[in-house]
């Protein structure tokens, strides 16, 4: 029997802590995933196509996450952040956060709508006939009208039936954005239409080509097209975004890029809300003149935009950007909002820059906030059913959608969402990605209760349960992952098609190119001979235990100081149990569920050489960014999704060598991978090298 230090059996807590944990099902028990679409991408290189299998794995895993154990009783526990090394918040802010009842705050958003309805009706009556006229662009139809109002119901019926009967195939085209980036546009077509060519996407890179409300043009200085000064990121996103296509955007800079795409989508959603509202008011006036007119201009409920973000700090930035772009000065409950969402505390400067960015400010991940727009004001904390925009964390909205108290469970307010945005998807993946899938399961469903809606004005594609084929979904992430691809490919069925960018990473810009350390790096590939993509985890485990484990036992490098880095928690538990039951290796283990005592004790024993191997999870590294000591060699059970983690972990060995405790010429870095790891490998070794690693004849490649 193996001897190991620490007994980290995983979490036994319930409530929010459990819901923050990541569970993945045993792939041997994998159930069939809804493979409604056959994906095709013309002119894509072999590496891009090889990542499709990885997308299927991620999609199957996320959809089968087991949520039966969620318990509501401990909801109000654990308000603290999952990374205690951050600087403490200011005392007044901490006291306030401890006092508020977050669950009650969310439930207030589901309260009776009657008071706001009366106020809203009064306001609409006083403002009818006060709509603005936009200047019509000469080179483009109004995409709001063409996508939502003028779309052929027969076409919607055909697409809907095609997805249902699995008769849809995406036809794609690829085009270059610049030397380091390309874009792929795909559109769903019936199998009977596959001989047709899809039109080239309209690329104008100009606000002037779209119907933007006059008040927004004035506020954002867009009246003169010569003053647009669009950044490269805004230029490539403007057209697919304002054409209501689905978007999967991988950006490169935490600070500037996030600010830029938020400015763009804030303008887009404001324009969408204003146009929706003004159309209803115009139709109200038309119906007063002729009540026999058919005016289909509404959904079941008012909310039209859902923005999903990881933390309150991100929510604060999003709301502030929307307020700035709107130009409205009257903001109801802004003081309360700042008290509950803003925090100027920062993580320690010793942490990496990316960590300080992700975990700055208020990192609380439990909230849902409604935003209601009137002619002269923005009302924060509005009732969800009377809101135009809902901003939430995955955990916060999960507690409404799948509340264990069935009387409090609701999803009707998501029935008429027309634009959904997931901001910082890469951070949300480290929380609990299954909550995003939960949202996608509940969005655009026909309401269970009859709301205050005029059914004579509800669009037919809402009544026919076809809203998901018109909904625009936009995902913004620092790194495109198999999960991100699975969401955009498997859960988004927008008739307008989908757009995503692809970074072309040179060897110089890769992790290895930026490492700055000469150390032996070995990449070992295992193949899925006769297996399917859902068997990949089993093949990896078998390869690791039969091949890589022998190197640990034989100690070809050092007798101790071996770090095994494991991205997936389920893989970590499987390997941990194997080493405990089937080997005699002395090992320590630390993961995201370890107590502080276990973390300190096991790290200390490993550093002192009392244990040979340290098992270390990626999620723990994401939340803590430990400076691990005593590392002489590293084994990556799977390539890290975040390429920064690859270099950070390797530098542990360099620091150990610098202290004279090891020889870097003897140290080795070993990475186990399959062809399904192409996305992660591109960022680590570069796009061209990754293609060779995935499809070359050799099974092992060395770098130094």
Curated annotation (Swiss-Prot):
Molecular functions per Gene Ontology: rRNA binding; U3 snoRNA binding
Region Disordered, annotated ranges: 1-140
A Pfam family it matches: UTP25_NTPase-like
Domain of life, per lineage: Eukaryota
Keyword set includes rRNA processing: yes
Subcellular location: Nucleus, Nucleolus
Primary site of residence: nucleus
Cysteine pairings via disulfide bonds: none
GO cellular component, one term: small-subunit processome
Protein's job: DEAD-box RNA helicase-like protein required for pre-18S rRNA processing, specifically at sites A0, A1, and A2.
Full protein name: U3 small nucleolar RNA-associated protein 25
Organism expressing this protein natively: Vanderwaltozyma polyspora (strain ATCC 22028 / DSM 70294 / BCRC 21397 / CBS 2163 / NBRC 10782 / NRRL Y-8283 / UCD 57-17) (Kluyveromyces polysporus)
């Amino acid at each position: 029997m193996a001897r190991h230090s620490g007994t980290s059996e995983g979490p036994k807590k319930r409530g929010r802590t459990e819901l923050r944990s990541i569970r993945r099902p045993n792939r041997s028990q994998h159930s069939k995933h809804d493979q409604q679409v056959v994906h095709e991408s013309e002119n894509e290189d072999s590496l891009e196509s090889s990542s499709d299998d990885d997308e299927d794995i991620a999609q199957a895993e996320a959809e089968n996450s087991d949520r039966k154990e969620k318990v509501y009783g401990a909801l109000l526990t654990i308000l603290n952040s999952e990374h205690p090394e951050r600087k403490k918040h200011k005392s007044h802010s901490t006291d306030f956060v401890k006092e508020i009842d977050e669950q009650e705050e969310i439930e207030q958003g589901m309260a009776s709508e009657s008071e706001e309805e009366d106020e809203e009706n009064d306001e609409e009556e006083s403002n009818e006939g006060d709509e603005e006229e936009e200047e019509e662009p000469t080179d483009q139809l109004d995409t709001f009208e063409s996508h939502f109002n003028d779309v052929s119901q027969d076409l919607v019926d055909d697409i809907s039936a095609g997805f249902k009967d699995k008769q849809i195939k995406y036809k794609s085209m690829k085009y270059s954005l610049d030397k380091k980036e390309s874009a792929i546009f795909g559109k769903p077509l019936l199998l009977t239409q596959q001989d047709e060519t899809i039109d080239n996407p309209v690329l104008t890179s100009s606000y002037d080509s779209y119907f933007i409300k006059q008040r927004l043009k004035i506020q954002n200085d867009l009246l003169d097209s010569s003053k647009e000064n669009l950044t490269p990121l805004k230029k490539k996103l403007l057209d697919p975004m304002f054409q209501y296509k689905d978007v999967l955007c991988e950006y490169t800079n935490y600070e500037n890029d996030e600010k830029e795409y938020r400015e763009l989508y804030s303008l887009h959603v404001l324009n969408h809300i204003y146009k929706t509202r003004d159309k209803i008011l115009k139709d109200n006036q038309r119906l007063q003149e002729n009540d026999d007119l058919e005016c289909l201009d509404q959904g079941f409920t008012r909310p039209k935009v859902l923005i999903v973000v990881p933390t309150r700090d991100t929510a604060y930035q999003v709301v502030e950007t929307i307020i700035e772009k709107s130009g409205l000065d009257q903001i109801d409950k802004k003081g309360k909002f700042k008290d509950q969402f803003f925090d100027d505390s920062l993580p320690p400067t010793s942490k990496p820059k990316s960590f300080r960015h992700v975990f700055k400010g208020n990192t609380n991940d439990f909230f849902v906030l409604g935003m209601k727009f009137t002619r002269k004001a923005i009302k924060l904390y509005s009732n969800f059913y009377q809101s135009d925009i809902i901003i939430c964390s995955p955990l916060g909205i999960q507690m409404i959608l799948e509340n264990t108290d069935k009387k409090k469970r609701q999803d009707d307010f998501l029935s008429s969402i027309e634009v959904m945005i997931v901001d910082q998807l890469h951070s949300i993946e480290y929380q609990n990605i299954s909550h995003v899938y939960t949202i996608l399961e509940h969005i655009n469903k026909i309401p269970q209760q009859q709301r205050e809606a005029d059914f004579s004005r509800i669009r037919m594609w809402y009544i026919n349960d076809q809203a998901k084929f018109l909904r625009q979904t936009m995902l913004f992430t620092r790194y495109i992952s198999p999960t991100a691809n699975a969401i955009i490919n498997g859960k988004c069925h927008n008739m307008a098609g989908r757009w995503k960018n692809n970074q072309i990473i040179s060897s110089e810009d890769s992790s290895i190119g930026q490492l700055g350390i000469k150390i032996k790096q070995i990449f070992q590939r295992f193949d899925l001979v006769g297996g399917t993509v859902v068997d990949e985890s089993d093949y990896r485990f078998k390869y690791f235990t039969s091949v890589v484990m022998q190197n640990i036992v034989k100690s070809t490098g050092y007798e101790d100081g071996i770090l095994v880095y494991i991205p997936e928690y389920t893989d970590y538990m499987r390997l941990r149990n194997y080493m405990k039951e089937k080997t005699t290796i002395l090992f320590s283990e630390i993961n995201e569920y370890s107590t502080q005592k276990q973390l300190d004790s096991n790290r200390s024993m490993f550093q002192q050489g009392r244990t040979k191997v340290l098992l270390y999870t990626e999620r723990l590294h994401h939340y803590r960014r430990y400076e691990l000591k005593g590392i002489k060699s590293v084994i990556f059970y799977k390539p890290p999704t975040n390429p920064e983690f690859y270099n950070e972990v390797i530098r542990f060995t360099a620091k150990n060598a610098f202290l004279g405790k090891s020889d870097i010429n003897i140290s080795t870095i070993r990475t186990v991978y399959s062809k399904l790891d192409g996305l992660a490998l591109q960022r680590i070794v570069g796009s061209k090298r990754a293609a060779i690693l995935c499809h070359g004849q050799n099974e092992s490649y060395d770098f130094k």
